[in-house]
Amino acid sequence: MKMFRRLSSVVVIALLMPLILVAMPVPAAQADQLPNPDWVALLSDYEKDYWQAPTDAAHGGKVLDAKTMELDQNLAVAINHKAAEDLDNKSLNAQRKRALVDSDLQAEETMPGALGPVLGAYMSEGLKQGKLNAVADVFSFNVASTYASKRAAMHPRPYLNRAESSFGGTNDLAGLPATLNIKQSPSWLEHVPGYSNLQKNSSYPSGHTTGAYSWGIALAGMIPELAPQIMARTSEAGNNRIVLGVHYPLDIMGGRIGASAQNGQYWHNEFSSSIVPAARQLRGYLTERCQADEHGSTLAACIADVKANGAGGYTNGFLDSVASEPVKDQASAVRVYTARLTYTFPQNTSQSGADFMAPRGAADVLRLAYPELHADQRNAILKATALDSGYPLWQSSDGWQRINWAKALCARVTLDKNGDVSKVETADHVTLTGPSVINAQYANIGKHPASDSAAGENSSVSAGPDLAVLHAAQRPALMVGAGVLVTILGAGATKAVMGKRSEKKRAESSTVRP
Protein backbone atom coordinates (compact mmCIF):
# COMPACT_ATOMS: atom_id res chain seq x y z
CA MET A 1 0.00 0.00 0.00
CA LYS A 2 1.34 3.40 -0.91
CA MET A 3 1.78 5.76 1.98
CA PHE A 4 -0.38 8.89 1.84
CA ARG A 5 1.97 11.84 1.97
CA ARG A 6 0.71 14.71 4.02
CA LEU A 7 1.88 18.11 2.99
CA SER A 8 2.47 19.33 6.51
CA SER A 9 5.68 20.09 8.33
CA VAL A 10 6.67 20.95 11.83
CA VAL A 11 8.64 23.41 13.90
CA VAL A 12 10.89 22.41 16.69
CA ILE A 13 11.05 23.54 20.31
CA ALA A 14 14.63 23.39 21.56
CA LEU A 15 15.94 20.29 23.26
CA LEU A 16 18.46 20.33 26.03
CA MET A 17 21.93 20.66 24.50
CA PRO A 18 24.43 17.84 25.01
CA LEU A 19 26.35 17.86 28.27
CA ILE A 20 29.42 19.18 26.48
CA LEU A 21 27.55 22.35 25.61
CA VAL A 22 26.62 25.28 27.78
CA ALA A 23 22.84 25.58 28.00
CA MET A 24 21.70 29.04 26.98
CA PRO A 25 18.89 30.64 25.00
CA VAL A 26 19.36 30.51 21.25
CA PRO A 27 18.33 33.70 19.48
CA ALA A 28 16.42 33.05 16.31
CA ALA A 29 17.93 34.33 13.09
CA GLN A 30 16.34 34.37 9.69
CA ALA A 31 18.28 32.78 6.88
CA ASP A 32 18.17 34.31 3.47
CA GLN A 33 16.02 32.29 1.11
CA LEU A 34 17.49 30.68 -1.98
CA PRO A 35 15.24 30.76 -5.06
CA ASN A 36 14.18 27.63 -6.89
CA PRO A 37 17.10 26.33 -8.96
CA ASP A 38 17.07 27.12 -12.68
CA TRP A 39 17.13 23.49 -13.74
CA VAL A 40 17.06 24.30 -17.46
CA ALA A 41 20.23 26.38 -17.12
CA LEU A 42 21.94 23.88 -14.80
CA LEU A 43 21.38 21.06 -17.29
CA SER A 44 21.93 23.04 -20.48
CA ASP A 45 25.32 21.51 -21.36
CA TYR A 46 23.30 18.67 -22.86
CA GLU A 47 21.65 20.94 -25.45
CA LYS A 48 24.85 22.92 -26.02
CA ASP A 49 27.24 20.01 -26.48
CA TYR A 50 25.40 16.80 -27.32
CA TRP A 51 21.86 17.20 -28.61
CA GLN A 52 19.96 19.97 -30.37
CA ALA A 53 16.32 19.69 -29.37
CA PRO A 54 13.55 19.53 -32.00
CA THR A 55 11.35 22.60 -32.21
CA ASP A 56 8.49 21.53 -34.49
CA ALA A 57 7.54 19.00 -37.18
CA ALA A 58 9.81 20.67 -39.71
CA HIS A 59 12.82 20.90 -37.42
CA GLY A 60 13.77 17.64 -35.77
CA GLY A 61 16.43 17.09 -33.18
CA LYS A 62 20.09 16.74 -34.07
CA VAL A 63 23.02 14.85 -32.54
CA LEU A 64 25.84 17.36 -31.99
CA ASP A 65 28.51 15.03 -30.58
CA ALA A 66 28.21 11.61 -32.18
CA LYS A 67 31.12 10.13 -30.23
CA THR A 68 29.67 10.96 -26.82
CA MET A 69 26.13 10.03 -27.80
CA GLU A 70 27.34 6.72 -29.22
CA LEU A 71 29.00 5.89 -25.91
CA ASP A 72 25.81 6.96 -24.12
CA GLN A 73 23.68 4.56 -26.19
CA ASN A 74 26.21 1.72 -25.99
CA LEU A 75 26.38 1.96 -22.21
CA ALA A 76 22.59 1.96 -22.04
CA VAL A 77 22.38 -1.21 -24.14
CA ALA A 78 25.19 -2.95 -22.24
CA ILE A 79 23.66 -2.24 -18.81
CA ASN A 80 20.19 -3.18 -20.03
CA HIS A 81 21.43 -6.47 -21.50
CA LYS A 82 23.50 -7.39 -18.44
CA ALA A 83 20.43 -6.92 -16.26
CA ALA A 84 18.44 -9.23 -18.55
CA GLU A 85 20.62 -12.28 -17.83
CA ASP A 86 19.44 -15.29 -15.82
CA LEU A 87 15.74 -14.56 -16.21
CA ASP A 88 13.10 -16.86 -14.78
CA ASN A 89 10.15 -18.25 -16.73
CA LYS A 90 8.38 -14.90 -16.31
CA SER A 91 11.33 -12.97 -17.79
CA LEU A 92 12.21 -11.57 -14.37
CA ASN A 93 15.19 -11.67 -12.04
CA ALA A 94 16.12 -9.96 -8.76
CA GLN A 95 17.56 -6.89 -10.47
CA ARG A 96 14.56 -6.35 -12.72
CA LYS A 97 12.23 -6.72 -9.74
CA ARG A 98 14.13 -4.06 -7.81
CA ALA A 99 14.10 -1.80 -10.86
CA LEU A 100 10.35 -2.22 -11.18
CA VAL A 101 9.87 -1.29 -7.52
CA ASP A 102 11.98 1.83 -8.05
CA SER A 103 9.85 2.60 -11.10
CA ASP A 104 6.92 3.26 -8.76
CA LEU A 105 8.72 6.46 -7.70
CA GLN A 106 7.83 6.03 -4.04
CA ALA A 107 10.36 7.08 -1.39
CA GLU A 108 8.96 4.65 1.15
CA GLU A 109 9.66 1.76 -1.24
CA THR A 110 13.10 2.81 -2.48
CA MET A 111 14.91 4.43 0.43
CA PRO A 112 14.56 2.18 3.52
CA GLY A 113 16.70 -0.55 1.99
CA ALA A 114 19.60 1.90 1.89
CA LEU A 115 19.91 1.46 5.66
CA GLY A 116 20.22 -2.32 5.43
CA PRO A 117 17.73 -5.05 6.38
CA VAL A 118 17.39 -4.19 10.09
CA LEU A 119 17.34 -0.40 10.15
CA GLY A 120 15.59 -0.42 6.78
CA ALA A 121 12.76 -2.53 8.17
CA TYR A 122 12.40 -0.13 11.09
CA MET A 123 12.25 2.86 8.75
CA SER A 124 9.77 1.19 6.42
CA GLU A 125 7.46 0.32 9.29
CA GLY A 126 7.74 3.81 10.73
CA LEU A 127 6.77 5.39 7.42
CA LYS A 128 3.85 3.03 6.88
CA GLN A 129 2.56 3.56 10.42
CA GLY A 130 2.77 7.35 10.21
CA LYS A 131 5.42 7.56 12.92
CA LEU A 132 7.88 9.33 10.62
CA ASN A 133 5.60 12.04 9.30
CA ALA A 134 8.32 14.70 9.38
CA VAL A 135 10.54 12.46 7.26
CA ALA A 136 7.67 11.82 4.85
CA ASP A 137 7.16 15.58 4.58
CA VAL A 138 10.80 16.06 3.56
CA PHE A 139 10.41 13.37 0.91
CA SER A 140 7.22 15.10 -0.31
CA PHE A 141 8.45 18.69 -0.44
CA ASN A 142 12.10 18.15 -1.33
CA VAL A 143 11.63 17.18 -4.98
CA ALA A 144 12.54 18.98 -8.16
CA SER A 145 10.38 19.58 -11.20
CA THR A 146 11.88 18.20 -14.41
CA TYR A 147 9.11 19.45 -16.70
CA ALA A 148 10.94 22.49 -18.09
CA SER A 149 14.29 20.74 -18.49
CA LYS A 150 12.64 17.86 -20.32
CA ARG A 151 10.86 20.29 -22.63
CA ALA A 152 14.22 21.91 -23.34
CA ALA A 153 15.76 18.61 -24.47
CA MET A 154 13.01 16.44 -26.00
CA HIS A 155 15.41 13.55 -26.56
CA PRO A 156 13.95 10.15 -27.59
CA ARG A 157 14.08 7.21 -25.22
CA PRO A 158 16.32 4.22 -26.03
CA TYR A 159 13.49 1.72 -26.62
CA LEU A 160 11.78 3.91 -29.26
CA ASN A 161 12.48 4.70 -32.90
CA ARG A 162 14.90 7.50 -32.18
CA ALA A 163 14.71 8.92 -35.69
CA GLU A 164 11.16 10.06 -34.98
CA SER A 165 10.86 13.48 -33.39
CA SER A 166 8.39 14.09 -30.57
CA PHE A 167 6.80 16.70 -32.84
CA GLY A 168 6.34 14.32 -35.75
CA GLY A 169 9.44 15.28 -37.70
CA THR A 170 12.72 13.45 -38.26
CA ASN A 171 15.78 13.58 -36.02
CA ASP A 172 19.31 13.76 -37.43
CA LEU A 173 21.18 11.03 -35.55
CA ALA A 174 24.54 11.69 -37.23
CA GLY A 175 24.82 8.09 -38.37
CA LEU A 176 23.78 6.50 -35.09
CA PRO A 177 21.17 3.72 -35.30
CA ALA A 178 17.52 4.66 -35.10
CA THR A 179 16.66 1.63 -32.98
CA LEU A 180 18.56 -0.11 -30.22
CA ASN A 181 18.18 -3.70 -29.12
CA ILE A 182 16.61 -2.85 -25.78
CA LYS A 183 15.27 -5.78 -23.77
CA GLN A 184 12.02 -4.66 -22.17
CA SER A 185 10.89 -6.01 -18.83
CA PRO A 186 7.40 -7.26 -18.03
CA SER A 187 5.53 -6.00 -14.98
CA TRP A 188 5.92 -7.68 -11.60
CA LEU A 189 2.94 -7.73 -9.26
CA GLU A 190 1.69 -4.12 -9.13
CA HIS A 191 5.02 -2.70 -10.32
CA VAL A 192 5.02 -1.65 -13.99
CA PRO A 193 7.82 -0.36 -16.24
CA GLY A 194 5.57 2.22 -17.90
CA TYR A 195 6.86 1.98 -21.46
CA SER A 196 3.56 3.07 -23.01
CA ASN A 197 3.38 6.20 -20.86
CA LEU A 198 6.84 7.55 -21.66
CA GLN A 199 6.84 7.72 -25.44
CA LYS A 200 6.36 11.50 -25.72
CA ASN A 201 8.42 12.24 -22.64
CA SER A 202 12.05 13.31 -23.06
CA SER A 203 14.67 10.91 -21.80
CA TYR A 204 16.81 13.79 -20.50
CA PRO A 205 16.91 14.36 -17.60
CA SER A 206 15.58 11.35 -15.74
CA GLY A 207 12.71 12.38 -13.47
CA HIS A 208 12.82 9.12 -11.51
CA THR A 209 16.52 9.66 -10.88
CA THR A 210 15.83 13.23 -9.82
CA GLY A 211 13.30 11.95 -7.31
CA ALA A 212 15.56 9.21 -5.98
CA TYR A 213 18.49 11.58 -5.50
CA SER A 214 16.25 14.19 -3.89
CA TRP A 215 15.33 11.61 -1.25
CA GLY A 216 18.73 9.92 -1.05
CA ILE A 217 20.78 13.06 -0.48
CA ALA A 218 18.34 14.18 2.21
CA LEU A 219 18.46 10.79 3.93
CA ALA A 220 22.26 10.66 3.76
CA GLY A 221 22.43 14.12 5.30
CA MET A 222 20.21 12.98 8.18
CA ILE A 223 22.01 9.64 8.70
CA PRO A 224 25.54 10.57 7.57
CA GLU A 225 27.07 7.54 9.31
CA LEU A 226 25.58 5.49 6.47
CA ALA A 227 25.96 8.07 3.70
CA PRO A 228 28.16 5.83 1.49
CA GLN A 229 25.57 3.04 1.45
CA ILE A 230 22.64 5.43 1.14
CA MET A 231 24.18 7.15 -1.85
CA ALA A 232 25.13 3.81 -3.44
CA ARG A 233 21.49 2.70 -3.14
CA THR A 234 20.39 6.03 -4.56
CA SER A 235 22.71 5.61 -7.53
CA GLU A 236 21.30 2.11 -8.02
CA ALA A 237 17.79 3.57 -8.25
CA GLY A 238 18.99 5.88 -11.00
CA ASN A 239 20.84 3.08 -12.75
CA ASN A 240 17.68 0.98 -12.63
CA ARG A 241 16.15 3.32 -15.19
CA ILE A 242 18.85 2.09 -17.59
CA VAL A 243 18.18 -1.48 -16.47
CA LEU A 244 14.58 -1.10 -17.69
CA GLY A 245 15.75 0.46 -20.95
CA VAL A 246 13.99 3.80 -20.54
CA HIS A 247 17.05 6.03 -20.01
CA TYR A 248 20.68 6.61 -20.93
CA PRO A 249 23.56 7.35 -18.51
CA LEU A 250 23.60 11.07 -19.36
CA ASP A 251 19.93 11.21 -18.32
CA ILE A 252 20.87 9.75 -14.94
CA MET A 253 23.72 12.20 -14.48
CA GLY A 254 21.37 15.07 -15.27
CA GLY A 255 18.88 13.83 -12.69
CA ARG A 256 21.59 13.75 -10.04
CA ILE A 257 22.56 17.34 -10.81
CA GLY A 258 19.00 18.60 -10.54
CA ALA A 259 18.33 16.78 -7.28
CA SER A 260 21.59 18.00 -5.77
CA ALA A 261 20.65 21.61 -6.50
CA GLN A 262 17.18 20.98 -5.08
CA ASN A 263 18.66 19.69 -1.83
CA GLY A 264 20.94 22.70 -1.57
CA GLN A 265 17.94 25.01 -1.73
CA TYR A 266 15.79 22.91 0.58
CA TRP A 267 18.44 22.39 3.25
CA HIS A 268 19.25 26.10 3.19
CA ASN A 269 15.67 27.37 3.33
CA GLU A 270 14.05 24.66 5.45
CA PHE A 271 16.88 23.55 7.72
CA SER A 272 15.36 24.54 11.06
CA SER A 273 11.72 24.10 10.12
CA SER A 274 11.87 20.76 8.27
CA ILE A 275 15.29 19.09 8.15
CA VAL A 276 16.14 19.24 11.86
CA PRO A 277 12.72 17.92 12.97
CA ALA A 278 12.90 15.10 10.42
CA ALA A 279 16.44 14.13 11.41
CA ARG A 280 15.56 14.20 15.08
CA GLN A 281 12.42 12.16 14.49
CA LEU A 282 14.13 9.55 12.31
CA ARG A 283 17.18 9.09 14.50
CA GLY A 284 15.09 9.00 17.66
CA TYR A 285 12.69 6.46 16.20
CA LEU A 286 15.48 4.21 14.95
CA THR A 287 17.18 4.42 18.33
CA GLU A 288 14.00 3.41 20.15
CA ARG A 289 13.54 0.42 17.85
CA CYS A 290 17.17 -0.57 18.32
CA GLN A 291 16.84 -0.36 22.09
CA ALA A 292 13.68 -2.47 22.06
CA ASP A 293 15.44 -5.19 20.07
CA GLU A 294 18.59 -4.98 22.23
CA HIS A 295 20.85 -3.74 19.44
CA GLY A 296 22.29 -1.00 21.63
CA SER A 297 21.28 2.09 23.55
CA THR A 298 22.38 4.55 20.87
CA LEU A 299 22.09 4.68 17.11
CA ALA A 300 25.86 4.41 16.79
CA ALA A 301 25.86 1.27 18.93
CA CYS A 302 23.01 -0.16 16.88
CA ILE A 303 24.77 0.49 13.58
CA ALA A 304 27.80 -1.34 14.94
CA ASP A 305 25.75 -4.21 16.37
CA VAL A 306 23.79 -4.94 13.19
CA LYS A 307 26.83 -4.11 11.02
CA ALA A 308 24.80 -1.61 9.01
CA ASN A 309 27.97 -0.03 7.62
CA GLY A 310 29.24 -3.42 6.47
CA ALA A 311 27.90 -6.85 5.63
CA GLY A 312 24.71 -6.20 7.62
CA GLY A 313 23.85 -3.05 5.72
CA TYR A 314 22.92 -2.25 2.14
CA THR A 315 24.62 -4.65 -0.24
CA ASN A 316 24.31 -5.12 -3.97
CA GLY A 317 25.77 -7.78 -6.20
CA PHE A 318 24.37 -6.49 -9.50
CA LEU A 319 27.37 -5.86 -11.74
CA ASP A 320 27.87 -4.17 -15.09
CA SER A 321 30.59 -2.34 -17.00
CA VAL A 322 30.29 0.69 -14.70
CA ALA A 323 29.55 -0.90 -11.31
CA SER A 324 32.23 -3.55 -11.66
CA GLU A 325 32.36 -4.67 -8.02
CA PRO A 326 29.65 -5.66 -5.53
CA VAL A 327 28.64 -3.26 -2.77
CA LYS A 328 29.49 -5.03 0.49
CA ASP A 329 30.81 -2.30 2.81
CA GLN A 330 31.52 1.42 3.03
CA ALA A 331 34.58 1.36 0.80
CA SER A 332 32.92 -0.51 -2.06
CA ALA A 333 29.81 1.67 -1.71
CA VAL A 334 31.89 4.80 -2.23
CA ARG A 335 33.69 3.29 -5.21
CA VAL A 336 30.50 2.18 -6.95
CA TYR A 337 28.81 5.51 -6.30
CA THR A 338 31.86 7.38 -7.60
CA ALA A 339 31.96 5.25 -10.75
CA ARG A 340 28.39 6.30 -11.52
CA LEU A 341 29.29 9.99 -11.27
CA THR A 342 30.89 9.74 -14.71
CA TYR A 343 29.61 6.39 -16.08
CA THR A 344 33.07 5.85 -17.67
CA PHE A 345 32.71 8.86 -19.98
CA PRO A 346 36.22 10.08 -20.77
CA GLN A 347 37.46 13.32 -19.28
CA ASN A 348 38.17 16.26 -21.54
CA THR A 349 41.68 16.86 -20.25
CA SER A 350 41.77 20.36 -21.74
CA GLN A 351 39.06 21.25 -19.20
CA SER A 352 40.59 19.46 -16.21
CA GLY A 353 41.91 21.20 -13.12
CA ALA A 354 39.29 23.96 -12.93
CA ASP A 355 38.95 25.33 -9.41
CA PHE A 356 35.93 23.99 -7.55
CA MET A 357 33.60 26.55 -6.01
CA ALA A 358 30.88 24.96 -3.92
CA PRO A 359 27.45 26.20 -5.06
CA ARG A 360 25.29 28.00 -2.54
CA GLY A 361 23.36 25.60 -0.37
CA ALA A 362 25.73 22.68 -0.78
CA ALA A 363 27.42 23.30 2.57
CA ASP A 364 24.01 23.28 4.27
CA VAL A 365 23.62 19.60 3.40
CA LEU A 366 26.70 18.90 5.55
CA ARG A 367 25.44 20.78 8.63
CA LEU A 368 24.24 17.73 10.55
CA ALA A 369 27.28 15.66 9.59
CA TYR A 370 29.73 18.29 10.86
CA PRO A 371 27.96 20.45 13.47
CA GLU A 372 31.32 21.70 14.77
CA LEU A 373 32.26 23.28 11.46
CA HIS A 374 31.38 26.53 9.75
CA ALA A 375 30.22 27.07 6.18
CA ASP A 376 33.66 27.71 4.69
CA GLN A 377 35.06 24.61 6.36
CA ARG A 378 32.22 22.49 5.02
CA ASN A 379 32.82 24.00 1.58
CA ALA A 380 36.43 22.88 1.91
CA ILE A 381 35.24 19.31 2.49
CA LEU A 382 33.13 19.50 -0.65
CA LYS A 383 36.12 20.79 -2.59
CA ALA A 384 38.49 18.13 -1.26
CA THR A 385 36.10 15.35 -2.27
CA ALA A 386 34.87 16.83 -5.55
CA LEU A 387 35.19 15.23 -8.96
CA ASP A 388 37.68 16.90 -11.27
CA SER A 389 36.37 19.13 -14.03
CA GLY A 390 36.13 18.03 -17.65
CA TYR A 391 33.45 15.35 -17.46
CA PRO A 392 30.08 15.65 -19.24
CA LEU A 393 27.60 18.24 -17.96
CA TRP A 394 30.03 19.91 -15.55
CA GLN A 395 30.21 23.40 -17.04
CA SER A 396 26.56 24.43 -16.78
CA SER A 397 25.94 22.65 -13.46
CA ASP A 398 27.32 25.41 -11.20
CA GLY A 399 29.42 22.82 -9.38
CA TRP A 400 26.63 20.36 -8.58
CA GLN A 401 27.86 17.79 -11.10
CA ARG A 402 31.21 17.56 -9.31
CA ILE A 403 29.95 16.98 -5.76
CA ASN A 404 30.54 13.49 -4.35
CA TRP A 405 27.98 13.11 -1.56
CA ALA A 406 29.15 9.62 -0.58
CA LYS A 407 32.57 11.02 0.27
CA ALA A 408 31.68 14.48 1.57
CA LEU A 409 28.98 13.41 4.04
CA CYS A 410 31.06 10.72 5.74
CA ALA A 411 34.70 11.69 6.10
CA ARG A 412 37.36 12.14 8.77
CA VAL A 413 38.28 15.81 8.61
CA THR A 414 41.41 17.30 10.18
CA LEU A 415 41.75 21.00 11.00
CA ASP A 416 45.07 22.79 11.37
CA LYS A 417 45.76 25.36 14.09
CA ASN A 418 44.18 28.08 11.96
CA GLY A 419 40.93 26.15 11.68
CA ASP A 420 41.52 25.40 8.02
CA VAL A 421 40.73 21.96 6.64
CA SER A 422 44.10 20.28 6.15
CA LYS A 423 43.05 16.70 5.44
CA VAL A 424 39.90 14.87 4.36
CA GLU A 425 39.92 11.07 4.57
CA THR A 426 37.03 9.19 3.00
CA ALA A 427 35.53 5.75 3.52
CA ASP A 428 37.15 4.28 0.43
CA HIS A 429 40.57 4.80 2.06
CA VAL A 430 40.02 4.52 5.83
CA THR A 431 37.54 2.69 8.05
CA LEU A 432 35.00 5.13 9.48
CA THR A 433 32.10 4.86 11.91
CA GLY A 434 30.71 8.18 10.73
CA PRO A 435 31.76 11.73 9.90
CA SER A 436 34.25 13.16 12.39
CA VAL A 437 36.50 16.15 13.02
CA ILE A 438 40.03 16.04 14.43
CA ASN A 439 41.20 19.22 16.17
CA ALA A 440 37.68 20.61 16.36
CA GLN A 441 38.88 23.04 19.04
CA TYR A 442 40.33 25.16 16.23
CA ALA A 443 37.05 25.47 14.32
CA ASN A 444 36.22 28.96 15.66
CA ILE A 445 39.57 30.59 14.95
CA GLY A 446 39.85 33.56 12.62
CA LYS A 447 37.38 34.19 9.84
CA HIS A 448 35.60 30.85 9.98
CA PRO A 449 32.64 31.80 12.22
CA ALA A 450 31.81 34.75 9.98
CA SER A 451 31.39 32.44 7.00
CA ASP A 452 28.05 31.21 8.38
CA SER A 453 26.35 34.58 8.15
CA ALA A 454 28.11 35.28 4.86
CA ALA A 455 26.53 32.09 3.51
CA GLY A 456 23.14 33.18 4.83
CA GLU A 457 22.82 30.26 7.22
CA ASN A 458 20.33 30.59 10.04
CA SER A 459 20.85 29.76 13.68
CA SER A 460 19.20 26.59 14.83
CA VAL A 461 18.21 24.66 17.88
CA SER A 462 19.85 21.35 18.56
CA ALA A 463 18.93 18.42 16.38
CA GLY A 464 19.37 16.19 19.38
CA PRO A 465 22.21 14.98 21.60
CA ASP A 466 23.87 13.22 18.67
CA LEU A 467 23.38 15.98 16.10
CA ALA A 468 24.10 19.22 17.91
CA VAL A 469 23.56 22.13 15.56
CA LEU A 470 25.58 24.79 17.29
CA HIS A 471 24.62 28.44 17.33
CA ALA A 472 27.60 30.75 16.87
CA ALA A 473 27.36 31.88 20.50
CA GLN A 474 27.51 28.29 21.69
CA ARG A 475 30.43 27.05 19.64
CA PRO A 476 33.07 28.27 22.14
CA ALA A 477 31.38 26.05 24.74
CA LEU A 478 32.35 22.96 22.79
CA MET A 479 34.96 21.63 25.18
CA VAL A 480 37.44 19.34 23.48
CA GLY A 481 41.10 18.83 24.24
CA ALA A 482 43.90 19.20 21.74
CA GLY A 483 43.83 16.44 19.19
CA VAL A 484 40.54 15.06 20.45
CA LEU A 485 38.36 13.41 17.85
CA VAL A 486 34.83 14.80 17.90
CA THR A 487 32.46 12.45 16.16
CA ILE A 488 28.75 11.86 15.82
CA LEU A 489 27.47 9.94 18.82
CA GLY A 490 24.43 7.72 19.11
CA ALA A 491 21.02 9.28 19.51
CA GLY A 492 20.01 10.10 23.08
CA ALA A 493 16.73 9.33 24.70
CA THR A 494 15.54 12.93 24.81
CA LYS A 495 12.55 13.39 22.53
CA ALA A 496 11.65 16.46 20.56
CA VAL A 497 8.59 18.45 21.50
CA MET A 498 7.07 19.44 18.23
CA GLY A 499 4.30 21.77 17.26
CA LYS A 500 2.36 22.12 14.11
CA ARG A 501 3.07 24.94 11.72
CA SER A 502 1.01 26.32 8.91
CA GLU A 503 1.47 24.74 5.54
CA LYS A 504 3.52 26.55 2.94
CA LYS A 505 3.08 26.32 -0.78
CA ARG A 506 6.18 26.27 -2.93
CA ALA A 507 6.66 29.08 -5.40
CA GLU A 508 6.60 26.58 -8.24
CA SER A 509 5.20 23.11 -8.74
CA SER A 510 7.34 20.34 -7.29
CA THR A 511 5.86 17.59 -9.43
CA VAL A 512 8.45 15.06 -10.52
CA ARG A 513 8.13 14.05 -14.14
CA PRO A 514 9.22 10.57 -15.21
Residue positions per predicted region:
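Bacterial N-terminal signal peptides that target proteins for export
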Residues: 1-14
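Secondary-structure boundary elements
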Residues: 220-229, 266-272, 459-468
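Extracellular Ser/Thr-rich, low-complexity/disordered mucin-like segments
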Residues: 451-484
